[in-house]
Amino acid sequence: VVRVSKRTVTFFPPAQARALIGDFTDWERNPIPLQGPVTLEFPEGAYVEYAFLDERGRPFPDPENPERADNPWWTYPRAVRLPGHRFEAPPQPREEPKVERHRLGERRFYVAEAGTSPKATLVAQDGVAFYRTAGLHRVAQALVEAGEIPPVRLVFVEPMDRNQEYRFSEAYEEEFHRVLGEVERSKGPLGEILLVGASLGGLFSLWQALRHPNRFPKVLALSPALKAHPGGTDAYRDREWLLERCAEAQVLPRIYLEVGLLEWLLAPARRFAALLADRKVPHAYRERASGHNWVTWKQALAPGLRYLLGEA
């Protein structure tokens, strides 16, 4: 059971609950021990995902809250919306683009086209999630139909081990470029390429734009996992190596950057946005009153595509 006020939520734990977890605790990383109800303060209008832990540390849903979070990873999160919450619903197309499945060796990827004779190519890491959960192809099609962006091709690349591949892996980088080459061979010129990624996928996309600025001039980065350095494995303690490289780079991409107020990557994203501002790099930056999840990221797709592909 939860009681919601203007800026606070009181969680009333069921009998078997020993801890509270959610976006605000980085889930199991910093659980809040429970001995009774607990009240937490959040930004006005926040969207909050949460769950409980039992005595064995296993997560389970709030049995009194029927609102399941739109979370592709786990079934136990439940959602709370504070007063004033407004979900910026992505636009929906009149006609949904057809998505084709492909494989290059063991690598799965998907290709779709929004409009005819695409002028640019959107390439998303965590391809299945951006296709099935976020509906990036539908958002792009709706914007094309509305005349807000030119026709685009979409490539959804699926990782096999995202934690390893997206952390500055040159082996995956080589395979990723082979996938783009295969798309170009089978579908035609890619045109301008816009990289899209969330969390570790956002980190990889920014890294690729830094390494190949002429090929990848634009990035849509959602809560990028900037706490990372080559050889590191700790998404909380690694140093922000990519920011160091961006501070030194002669050329930086045009970037649309979003992050949630309820996630541990907020401070790194703010530092990155400040660096872009200091260097006068064309960029847009936005914070939302939610966490490290697809509800946050889905809302960023349309404004991000408008900023990166629409007319100025």
PLM segments and residue spans:
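N-terminal cap/lid segment of alpha/beta-hydrolase-fold proteins
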Residues: 71-115
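Primarily recognizes the serine-hydrolase "nucleophile elbow" in alpha/beta-hydrolase
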Residues: 135, 190-242, 247-250
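Alpha/beta-hydrolase active-site loop
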Residues: 167-187
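Aromatic-rich carbohydrate-binding modules that target alpha-glucans
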Residues: 1-47, 53-85
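Short beta-strand element of the alpha/beta-hydrolase
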Residues: 118-128
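The feature captures the conserved acid-bearing segment of alpha/beta-hydrolase catalytic domains
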Residues: 229-289, 295
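Active-site nucleophile loop of the alpha/beta-hydrolase fold
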Residues: 127, 159, 220-229, 261
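Short amphipathic alpha-helix adjacent to the substrate-entry channel of hydrolases
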Residues: 133-153
